Each structure stands twice: as C-alpha cells, then as structure tokens.
Amino acid sequence: MRSARLGRLLWMLFITEIQAATELPEEKYILAEGETLNVNCPVTVGVYSNSRKAWQKLNRNGKFQTLAITERVSGQVSKVQVGKIFLTDEPSEGMLHVQMTNVQAEDSGLYRCVIYQPPKDPIILFYPVRLVVTNYSSGTPASAETPTQSCSPTTTLPPTTTTNRHRPRPRTVRTVTQFLTDFTTSLSSPGLKVTLTNVTDITRDTEISLILPAVCGLLSKSLVFIVLFVVTRMSFTP
C-alpha cells in the first residue's frame, strides 16, 4: 500500500516537472493606454512561408482564442486587419509583423503568433508575449524603477508609438531575436531599401534554441524519475 502511494506521488511529481520544463519564457511589453504594440515573429523561410499565420490571446478559460488569421498567398505579402489588429505576412523575409493600435487596459494578457493549421495543433513561432497596459499617459514613465529628476520645465510631447518597451533577458537566443527585431524596425523608414540575407539562419537557430531546452529538460526529468523508481523498488524489496 505504501509503495503504491509513493509510486503515485512520484508519478505526479514527474508530470509536473515535465510541464514546467516545456514551458517557454515570455517576452514582456509594458505600454500605456493609447499606444501601439508591435511584434515581429520570425518564420522559417521555405517551410512555413505559404502557411497561414494567426495572432492568439489566452482567454479566461485557459485556452487560446484566435484574433486574426492571414490568408494563404504563395510568395506574396499578405495583409489582414481585424479591428485594431494588423497582420502582415512577408514570406520572402520570413517575418510576421503584428500590430495592435490603441491598446487599453482590457487588452492586457498573454498573446502568441502561431502557424494556423486546424485541426492540428498550432505551431508557436515566437516567445509568448505578455502585454501589460497601464493607465499612464505617454509622457509619464510606465515603470517607477527608473525615475528621472529635473529642475527645468518639461515639455509635453505628442503620443508616440512604443515598439519594444520591455526588460531584456540575458539569453543568447533572445538577444539574436531582439537584434533582428530592432534591425528590421530601424530599416522601415521611407526611402531605405535593404535586403536581409541571413534571416533564414537566424530563424532556424531560434527554432532549434526553442526545442533544445525542452528536450534537455524532458531527458533530465526522465533520468530523475528512473533513479527514484529504482531506489523505491530497492527499498521495498525483501
């Protein structure tokens, strides 16, 4: 009886550890009401170029709800607008651009961009995005961690679009992805025409880096479970 209870306890612990190991880190964006969220999701060129992409949000029931879906257009740029959500799929560049304008407090939550392929499960393209919308104005800092003091008069500036106001994490993969995002944004000014040649390699490295930690975590948890199981069997063997 004791061995059966211990076995069930070990199994529950094993399942919990597996779920924790397979969870992806989040990208956090902190915006004020009325600002615009911009997210660039890398797509593997030649693999998912012609696949439909979607922007989803986690609802209160714990399930992701599809907010907008792109059309399947072979080799061409696809643009879709659903309310204040804009999706731009650029197959040649291997990038899905997501834009949400005039964000409000109720827009706060967890989002993700995926390959949309029902009835199959969607394929996550990028880190889940955690959006936090505050009620601060555009001229007020969204966080109290970096206060500024000034004795001179201040000038109120018109609202601006904030594309990437989040705290960077010390991860190599995220640094590469963020570099690609900032580089793409900085080259989006009118009159500039630049061809990116290494997008495929970066997106492939991103996918490998997403899968490799989950596999390593699963293998490590399996090894722990096997050792615990052997020790349990030996302790109850007469």
UniProtKB/Swiss-Prot annotation:
Pfam families: V-set
Protein name listed in UniProt: Triggering receptor expressed on myeloid cells 1
Annotated signal sequence range: 1-20
Subunit record text: Monomer. Homomultimer; when activated. Interacts with TYROBP/DAP12. Interacts with TLR4.
Hydrolase is among the record's keywords: no
InterPro entries in the cross-refs: Ig-like_dom, Ig-like_dom_sf, Ig-like_fold, Ig_sub, Ig_V-set
Superkingdom classification of source: Eukaryota
